[in-house]
Amino acid sequence: TNFLFSNYLTNFEVGMKIVLINYSVTPMMTAIAKRLEELGHQAIIATATGDVEGSRRMADLKIGNSVDRAVHNALAWLSDTHGMHSTRVTASLLDRIIALNPDVVHLAGLNNSFINIPFMAYVLMRCKMPVALSVTEGTIPGTGRKSLIKRDRFRRRTMESTFGAWDLLHLVCNSKHTAERAAEEGLDGHPTYIISTDDTAKAVEQYITLYDNIK
């Protein structure tokens, strides 16, 4: 895997449109959205649960509801298929994303069971939309979730095939160690960037530089 380090802000074209997706709004997402708007760009936040303490911003798009999430969690716990349900919810979200036609889709977190990852990957690939996926060691898709029936080989094979075929995917890790762990879990073969979240202001500028470079 090639690790690319982005440490400066370039001159941006006016009018980037960025969709940020996560289970809930985070302070980092809020900071990115605020900075994008200061630069004359558009930020659309899509989450399952809306606002969280410290974010100071509500989601622009709501992803499913508590019943959808409960069903997803129950099915995933029974069959070790976290991130492989909520097809209807994911289709609804994708319809709205396609209508928005963003320059970049930023998946700020996929560790909670609220969307269908393989389905989302397939549609975004077909639409040829650049995607940035942020991961930490504890939020690598397909890892760290408990289930009644463990199906390690099936889960790993599904995630490897999903991410292996995902064209225009850019992986953003908070450390080189996380990048190495992600590669071990089948997320290798994509441009990989290291953006530490220790300094929020610096991370925001690096993310916006990344959007401009991959759009």
Predicted segment positions?
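A conserved catalytic-core segment of Leloir-type glycosyltransferases
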Residues: E38, I45-V104
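Active-site proximal beta-strand in glycosyltransferases
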Residues: V104-H106, A121-G144, V172
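Membrane-proximal helix-turn-helix segments that form the acceptor-binding/catalytic region
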Residues: Y122-R126, G138-T139, R151-L171
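N-terminal subdomain of nucleotide-sugar transferases
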Residues: L4-A59, R126-M129, W166, N174, ...
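Short N-terminal targeting/anchoring amphipathic segment
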Residues: L20, L94-I115, P130-S134
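Helix-loop-beta element that forms the nucleotide-linked donor phosphate-binding surface
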Residues: A179-T197
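C-terminal alpha-helical cap of glycosyltransferases
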Residues: D199-K215
